[in-house]
Curated annotation (Swiss-Prot):
Induction: Transcriptionally up-regulated by Anr in response to Fe(3+) in oxygen-limiting conditions. Stimulated by glycine. It comes from Pseudomonas protegens (strain DSM 19095 / LMG 27888 / CFBP 6595 / CHA0). Belongs to the FAD-dependent glycerol-3-phosphate dehydrogenase family. The keyword Ubl conjugation does not apply. This is Hydrogen cyanide synthase subunit HcnC. Keywords: Cell membrane, Lipoprotein, Membrane, Oxidoreductase, Palmitate, Signal, Transmembrane, Transmembrane helix. FAD binds at residues 7-21.
Length: 417
């Protein structure tokens, strides 16, 4: 049986769900959200940080990633392990700052909307983010961050050791202070995806879980639908690729071009519930921590090039544990509830891939968000809704178009409609 929709969204993670929710508010579009429910979606590798500045300047799992990459490059160049110079922070382009900050600003209203209209609470909390400083290397890193973002000086605050202890009494005495980002907050990453999905469903979106897209249909240079393994054929006017770490495969099927999105493994762990231990989100050069509303603390996250592997490994989990205990010694006495791994959709420049592909109609990208999918899901949904409806965009997406990559098309016989 053939199903007919205006929009089919392939991928029901936080990005696809946000797109579905924003499109559903139109009421005049017929929308399908298709998700394979495969293990390893990117939300599983997230602590739910809305760290618009923190992630833009390479903190959170970004600082772990940057230090790993820097060490690897220096080993390749010098043939031996070296100390990474943390005085050169990994700053993303201004276009990403604009993208992330606009998304962050949407969350208070979005939270009220999903709570009020759909009774879905994704636990938005205004916590701030503190980069904990242990030594001179960390301080140099923080100073260079501040030097790179003078236009955001009102959103950062230095905390000396006494101020940090007053704000976070359980932080180690080893910490010399912190750099705090006042507009960076948090949500529950799993509840956020559920909230988008349920809001979309209540607004009339048809949701197909445990369903794989197995092929893409074409009429000339236009995408006209998809084939699935268990739900049959879907005809559509627009296909949105929100397939996360699997987006390259869908792009190849739809356009003949394999966009450069690959899985980046992130291991994370969760503690038992406990009384309030952290007043805000913390990030160090070893890990990040976020205590949720139920008392559990999420500790993350590794950044590994391991393909689609989602197994957990002792050395990496132990490294996160040691980093967390170094920052908050009380955690040495806490039980771990579980650990797991998720797959972030990484792109070569760490920026998302959004919008149309040259020469192909009826197809839009919404993928490649790497470590910032939770943060930027809100603005991505808004942008894709406006792209589908051919309306003016709230920001320029030129830096995020797939054409920035010199990717040659792969010859692939398109499936006819």
């Amino acid at each position: 049986m053939i199903k007919h929709y205006d929009v089919v969204i392939a991928g029901g993670g936080v990005i696809g769900a946000s797109c579905a929710y924003q499109l559903s508010k139109r009421k005049d579009l017929k929308v399908a959200l298709i998700d394979a429910k495969r293990p390893g979606n990117a939300s599983r590798a997230s602590a739910g940080g809305l760290w618009a500045i923190g992630e833009s300047v390479g903190l959170g799992c970004g600082v772990i990633f940057f230090r790993m990459m820097s060490a690897n490059r220096k080993r390749e160049a010098q043939g031996s392990a070296v100390v990474v110079d943390s005085s050169t922070p990994h700053i993303l382009p201004q276009s990403f700052f604009d993208f992330a900050l606009q998304s962050n600003e949407l969350y208070p209203r979005l939270h009220r909307e999903l709570m009020g209209l759909h009774n879905m609470d994704f636990k938005f909390e205004q916590t701030g983010l503190k980069f904990v400083i242990y030594d001179e290397e960390d301080r140099l890193y923080a100073e260079h961050i501040v030097g790179c973002i003078p236009h955001l000086s009102d959103q950062v605050r230095w905390l000396d050791q006494a101020a940090l202890r007053a704000s976070e009494p359980n932080v180690s005495h080893e910490a010399q202070g912190a750099l705090e980002f006042l507009c960076d907050h948090q949500v529950n990453p799993f509840r956020l995806t559920d909230a988008y999905t349920e809001g979309a469903r209540q607004n009339g979106v048809d949701v197909y879980f445990n369903t794989n897209v197995t092929g893409v249909l074409h009429q000339g240079n236009r995408v006209s639908g998809v084939k699935t393994d268990v739900a049959g054929l879907f005809r559509c006017t627009t296909l949105i690729n929100a397939a996360g770490a699997w987006a390259a495969e869908l792009s190849l099927q739809a356009t003949g071009i394999e966009i450069p999105v690959k899985p980046v493994k992130g291991q994370i762990l969760l503690t038992e519930r406990m009384p309030k231990l952290l007043n805000g989100c913390l990030t160090t050069s070893d890990c990040y921590m976020a205590q949720k509303d139920n008392g559990e603390i999420l500790i993350g996250s590794t950044t590994e090039d391991k393909g689609f592997d989602v197994t957990t490994t002792y050395p990496e989990i132990n490294g996160l544990v040691q980093g967390a205990v170094r920052c908050v010694p009380e955690l040495a006495h806490v039980n771990l509830k579980r650990c797991w791994a998720g797959l972030r959709p990484g792109s070569p420049d760490e920026l998302p891939i959004l919008g149309p592909m040259d020469g192909v109609e009826g197809y839009l990208n919404a993928c490649g968000h790497f470590r910032t999918g939770i943060l930027t899901s809100a603005i991505t949904g808004v942008l894709l809704d406006k792209l589908v409806n051919e309306e003016a965009l709230p920001l320029d997406i030129t830096p995020f178009l797939a054409r920035r990559f010199a990717t040659a098309p792969v010859k692939k016989q398109p499936e006819p409609a």
